[in-house]
């Protein structure tokens, strides 16, 4: 059996513990170090996963250990420093999580430093890594369903266009094999629009895509939220990580739902966290395309910022890529500062016994 990948977990809050649980279960990975600022949680999570190399932060960890992989699962404010520390330490691959940053310049810096050092920069636990979405994307590329004629997005981000909405944006770009090149938007309420955060901001928009498609975007649900893509006789509906398929029409002209017959997923316990991690390992080992990359998270941030500023400036069409890389959009406080700093701290008892769930 090949030598196990040595993994460092940077940040062991609730989501970091999910990552640790997955890496602990895979046969070809082992957790060799943990960095966690909370002293009590660091101790109990180390005990839970049998890890004795415990550190306060990423910089302290990398002075002693250079693992193969580093999983950065920190509140948004602290992601950049840890990702860059991992790249400069010489890891083979580093994963982040959502949202990658608040400012485009910070996202650019992470992407550029990893690229310059030959470090795989993976995106983390995002729905785009779902095996159903990845299999659908492969089928679309192979022409199974014909030419894409349209796309639409409902309930974008559920009032968090960056912190939550990065999910749908990454899937939209994947399934259409296209980039968003122009955004025009309408948003409210006004106080949310004028703030520096996406918290409570509802956005309606029109995205122009590099392949000629126009994608209408609604802030609200119409009984479901998610992404619809259609061809001449097929409608593909993405609801989070799950995909529904409609092909052909009945006698009344109504679409007929069919079984997409996706292949079996080898790690159902881990859902798209599992497929995301396997994608990172494959990229490190074989140079294969990542299911979700740091670049993808940067693109999602850029689209969200463009939508916010288009509305703020009076529904002005905004071209992408944005020239001003200092533009900023903070996520909700709990995403930016973490649960401990936003009124939802994790107890030691929960950290000691928390079961793995996605």
Regions found by a protein language model. Name each.
Residues 1-49:
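N-terminal Rossmann-like dinucleotide-binding module
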Residues 19, 49-114:
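Beta-loop-alpha module in the N-terminal Rossmann-like domain of NAD(P)-dependent dehydrogenases
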Residues 30-33, 283-298:
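Glycine- and charged-residue-rich phosphate/anionic-cofactor binding loop of Rossmann-like
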Residues 42, 82, 110, 136, ...:
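Aromatic/hydrophobic pocket-lining residues that form π-stacking "cages" and hydrophobic walls in ligand
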Residues 69, 95, 100-160:
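A contiguous active-site-proximal alpha/beta segment in oxidoreductase catalytic domains
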Residues 74, 290-332:
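A contiguous, mid-protein "functional segment" used to position or interact
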Residues 149-224, 228, 295:
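Rossmann-like dinucleotide-binding domain that binds NAD(P)(H)
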Residues 193-198, 210-276, 293, 307, ...:
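NAD(P)-dinucleotide binding in Rossmann-like oxidoreductases
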């Amino acid at each position: 059996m090949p030598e196990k990948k040595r993994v460092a977990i940077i940040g062991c809050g609730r989501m970091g513990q999910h990552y640790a649980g997955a890496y602990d279960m895979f046969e070809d990975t082992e957790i060799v170090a943990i960095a966690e600022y909370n002293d009590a949680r660091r101790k109990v999570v180390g005990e839970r996963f049998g890890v004795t190399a415990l550190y306060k932060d990423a910089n302290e960890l990398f002075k002693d250990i250079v693992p193969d992989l580093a999983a950065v699962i920190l509140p948004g404010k602290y992601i950049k420093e840890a990702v860059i520390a991992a790249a400069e330490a010489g890891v083979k691959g580093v994963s982040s999580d959502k949202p990658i940053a608040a400012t485009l310049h910070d996202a650019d810096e992470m992407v550029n430093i990893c690229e310059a050092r030959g470090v795989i920069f993976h995106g983390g636990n995002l729905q785009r890594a779902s095996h159903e979405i990845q299999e659908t994307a492969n089928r679309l590329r192979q022409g199974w369903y014909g030419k894409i004629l349209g796309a639409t997005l409902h309930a974008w981000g559920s009032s968090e266009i960056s912190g939550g909405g990065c999910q749908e944006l990454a899937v939209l770009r994947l399934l259409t094999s296209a980039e968003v090149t122009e955004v025009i938007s309408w948003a409210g309420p006004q106080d949310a629009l004028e703030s520096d955060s996406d918290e409570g901001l509802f956005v309606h928009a029109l995205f122009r895509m590099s392949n000629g498609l126009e994608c209408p975007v609604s802030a609200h649900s119409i009984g479901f939220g998610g992404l619809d893509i259609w061809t001449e006789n097929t409608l593909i509906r993405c609801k989070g990580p799950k995909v529904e398929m409609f092909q052909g029409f009945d006698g009344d002209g109504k679409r007929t739902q069919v079984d997409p017959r996706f292949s079996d997923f080898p790690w159902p316990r881990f859902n798209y966290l599992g497929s995301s991690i396997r994608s990172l390992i494959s990229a490190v080992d074989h140079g294969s395309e990542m299911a979700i990359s740091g670049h993808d998270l940067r693109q999602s941030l850029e689209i969200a910022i463009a939508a916010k500023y288009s509305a703020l400036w009076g529904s002005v069409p905004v071209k992408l890529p944005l020239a001003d890389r200092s533009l900023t959009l903070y996520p909700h406080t709990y995403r930016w500062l973490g649960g401990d700093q936003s009124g939802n701290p994790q107890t030691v008892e929960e950290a000691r016994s928390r079961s793995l769930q996605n």
